[in-house]
Amino acid sequence: MPATRPPALAVDVGGTKLAAALVDGEGRLTWQARVPTPGAGEAEALWATLAALVAGAPPGAEVCGVSCAGPMDTAAGLVSPLNIPAWRGFPLRDRLAAATGLPTWLDNDAKALALGEGLFGAAVGRRSYLSMVVSTGVGGGIVLDGRLLDDDGGNAGHIGHLIVEPGGRRCACGAHGCLEAEASGTAVAAVTGAPAAAAGPEVRARVGTLVGRAVASVANLLDLRLAAVAGSVALGYGEEFFGPAQEEVDRCARLAFSAGTRIVASALGADGPLVGAAAVAWWGAGVASLCSPPPSPPPVAPSPPGP
């Protein structure tokens, strides 16, 4: 069994808000605060806003975990979130470690959510699943056989850049028709000319359909049966999103191993990003395990000798 999970300072960097919390070892928030993400400005001005937020945290944390949109280089601790143009190659991990005096780990926001869902949420006990954030942007985190899918840079699972509408809208990454360019809150606002929260039923259903299409592709590719989805767009649209999303999963995931894949709302609710950020710290510190390993098969008894 892993060691006891220590209290964590959790930091979530989003396109519309910056949030921080103290999270105990059972995933409960004992303090939290948030401020709007500055809409414009230089890298240092944005950092000053985040540093002031973190400085207000009460004492007690032993580790720090950070979730942020990608792309990023987790080995170097650098972030270049597409939804925060001011930060390109910004040394977020090291800045927070210096500001807090805590050992600090950094990961993609959707991968962080995947850890949180596996520890406390909709994926408890699951060995393989997909976690998604559908908010200002779209991100994904994948767990296979109890292990978070990762790579040297920390960018594995970028479901927001699956092509779901060939020849569609241009994405910030430079491609056309990416899920993020078609179904994120930023995309909805650009198309409708109003905040994503004001979108009508047809737009909400289309967002769900496109997310379901991407989920089905991942289910077919990786033999996954569950997708847990969080984020202000998905959770805010509710059944107007999840109904069409499930219908599209059912339509597109038809192989024997992917049929029946479910897409569900995150069980962590609005606290998911911060619980996920804390889980990043525990995972990095080696005190988090997503599920117990499968039991070893019993040894096969030798056949008795013949007469």
Q: What is each stretch, according to the model?
A:
Residues 12, 65-69, 131-137, 141-143:
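Short beta-strand segments
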Residues 104-108:
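General beta-strand structural signal in soluble alpha/beta enzymes
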Residues 113-119, 139-142, 162:
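Adenylate-forming
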